[in-house]
Amino acid sequence: MTEKDESVKSNSEYTEEQEVKNEDTSTVENVEDTTSDSDNSSNDSSNEESSEETAVDPKDEEIQQLQLKANENEEKYLRLYAEFENYKRRIQKENETNKTYQSQRVLTDILPTIDNIERALQIEGDDESFKSLQKGVQMVHESLLRALKDNGLEEIESEGQAFDPNFHQAVVQDDNPDFKSGDITQELQKGYKLKDRVLRPSMVKVNQ
C-alpha cells in the first residue's frame, strides 16, 4: 500500500470517529432535552396541583358563610327564647302574688272595725235588752271573722308565745314569775296576717 492510500484510509477513519462522536453528543443532548422537558412538565403539573389545592371553591366559601349566619341566628333565637320564658315566669308569679294578696288593702281597712266590735263585746250589762243586743253583735263578729278567714285572714298567736319581732310589737315590759323571760304575758291588741304576710303585728306585753 502506498503512502497515499494510507493517508486516505487514515482520513476516512478520522471522519468516521468524528461522526460517531457527533452522534454520541447529539444523543446526550437529546437525552438532556428530554429530561429537561420532563422536569419542566413535572414542575408545571406540580404547580397546577398546588394552585388547585390553594384555590377555594366559591360554593364552599358561600356554604361556610351561610353556616356561620345560621349559627348566629340560632344563638339569637335561643337568647330571645330564654328571655321570653323568664318574662312569662315573672308575669305568672306576679299574677299569682296579686291574686293571693288582692284583698290585703280591704282586710287592712276592716281591722279597726273588728277592734271596735271586740271592745263593744267587752262591755258588761245586766239589762235584758243590752244582753240581746250584745248577742247580736257577737253573731255579727263571728260571721265577719269567718268570712275574713275564708279570704286568708289569720290571727297571730301571742299570749304565752315567745316574743318574735316579725309578728309582735312590744309596748310594755312585765315582771311575771309565771312566764319565762322573753315570753308574752298579755296581748294588748290583736295582730293579723294574710297567709304569710303580716297585716298588723300584735301589740304585746313582754316578760323581762
Swiss-Prot record:
Keyword check for Coiled coil: no
GO aspect biological process, one term: protein folding
Cystine residue pairs: none
Keywords: Chaperone, Cytoplasm, Stress response
Region Disordered: start-end pairs: 1-62
Cited SUPFAM superfamilies: Coiled-coil domain of nucleotide exchange factor GrpE, Head domain of nucleotide exchange factor GrpE
CDD domains listed in its UniProt record: GrpE
PROSITE patterns: GRPE
Predominant cellular place of this UniProt entry's protein: cytoplasm
Start-end of Acidic residues biased regions: 46-55
Alphabetized Gene3D superfamilies for the sequence: 3.90.20.20, Head domain of nucleotide exchange factor GrpE (2.30.22.10)
An example Gene Ontology CC term for this record: cytoplasm
Cellular compartment(s): Cytoplasm
InterPro entries per the UniProt record, alphabetical: GrpE, GrpE_coiled_coil, GrpE_head
One Pfam short name: GrpE
Record GO terms (molecular function): adenyl-nucleotide exchange factor activity; protein homodimerization activity; protein-folding chaperone binding; unfolded protein binding
Keyword Cell membrane carried by entry: no
Known role: Participates actively in the response to hyperosmotic and heat shock by preventing the aggregation of stress-denatured proteins, in association with DnaK and GrpE. It is the nucleotide exchange factor for DnaK and may function as a thermosensor. Unfolded proteins bind initially to DnaJ; upon interaction with the DnaJ-bound protein, DnaK hydrolyzes its bound ATP, resulting in the formation of a stable complex. GrpE releases ADP from DnaK; ATP binding to DnaK triggers the release of the substrate protein, thus completing the reaction cycle.
Family listed: Belongs to the GrpE family.
Subunit structure: Homodimer.
Protein name per Swiss-Prot or TrEMBL: Protein GrpE
Organism of provenance: Staphylococcus haemolyticus (strain JCSC1435)
